[in-house]
Amino acid sequence: MLDMRQMLICSAILLTLSMGIRHGFGLWLQPMTQAMSWGREDFSLAMAVQNLTWGFAGIFSGMVADRFGAFRVIVVGILLYALGLFGMAHATTPLALLLSAGVLIGLAQAGTTYVVVYGIIGRNTPVEKRSYAMGLAAAAGSFGQFLMMPVEGFLISSLGWQQALMALATIALFLLPLTWGLREPAFAQGQSPRRDQTIVQALREALSYPSFQWLMAGFFVCGFQVVFIGVHLPSYLKDKGLGPEVAGYALALIGLFNVFGTYGVGLMGSRFSGRQLLTCNYLGRSVVISVFLWVPVSNWSVYIFSCCMGFLWLSTVPPTNGTVAKIFGLSHFSMLGGSVFFGHQLGSFMGVWLGGWLYDHTGSYDVVWYISIGLGLVAALFNWQVNESPIERGHPQVSAA
């Protein structure tokens, strides 16, 4: 097993930068579309494809990580990240933007974020410390969102949007040395864990299991909400007459309070069930968004909304992945984690694309906000039905009420 401190430090730095860089892509929406005379739908489609590619590729990166270890997957992911950022900086058509920011960076994220990292943590952490370790890793990714927002805003204002992307590509390459700290000894020696199921059997079992379906549907809602807000909130606030610095502070606050939320939910994982934590999270999101739309828009209403939403932002990730591990075990954990995350990314695709499409056709984001509220209520209902008991193969599941 890996040394736990080494594993958590390397995982934290990797997630800080890989998650942090992508969190700021909304800052590029207006400068890129204005400079290239594109519609918001063009940029939104590229971000939507990025999230969809991330989710779909995550299933396969999980398979490879389960079979051969995460080291090679992460190295390839980092190289693709740098290449995608370079291509995004030099995109001159919507198609080029879609291929670079959409496909390449989507593939990169599948190899450098939670799907792969949580597999390492699950295999190298005692079960009683797993929730804490996953919460700590999620908090690191959240800190990256807080850290990188002002960094990316500064790079854009000082270098211009194109050179800022080139700078981020260089930063991404500095992640390569960290991969040695995540090289699992057994995989490095050509060994892999013994499994009672094939990949196809494990995937078929999970996809036909009601609780996995509920988790996947709930994660769809999570993706819809957070990516819509992350990409379109800056433009929404500008349309409301607020300065660009308000959007920068808002996204930074989301990242900061996400640190507290993800770390806190990791600690609470030993006291409350995953379905309880997830149900409360999705209900809370609907309440927070409803209040935000109800009160007059001001700097302070935006900051309070960002703090509350940030606390709920990615605190779905540790209990969702922890519940998957409880039900199905660790043999195919990275693949199954990638599969449930695919639901998240389907939601991300819909949230970011629908936001741009409805804005271009109605001149407003209001409908998407209302959809987000309704989906939060549906996700709370879905997750309340999850049964976290380890699967008894060959026996039907009884849903928890």
Question: What are the residue ranges of the model-derived segments?
Answer:
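Helix-to-loop junctions at the C-terminal end of transmembrane segments
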Residues: 57-69, 262-273, 360
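Extracytoplasmic gate region of multi-pass secondary transporters
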Residues: 25-29, 210-263
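C-terminal transmembrane helical hairpin of 12-TM major facilitator-type secondary transporters
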Residues: 254-258, 271-323
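Cytoplasmic helix-loop-helix junction between adjacent transmembrane helices
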Residues: 101-139
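Conserved MFS/SLC helix-loop-helix module at the cytosolic interface between two early adjacent transmembrane helices
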Residues: 56-95
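Hydrophobic core of transmembrane alpha-helices in multi-pass small-molecule transporters
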Residues: 16, 96-112, 220, 301-315
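Helix-loop-helix hairpin linking two adjacent transmembrane segments in secondary transporters
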Residues: 137-187
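Intracellular juxtamembrane helix-capping segments at the cytosolic ends
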Residues: 32, 111-125, 315-328
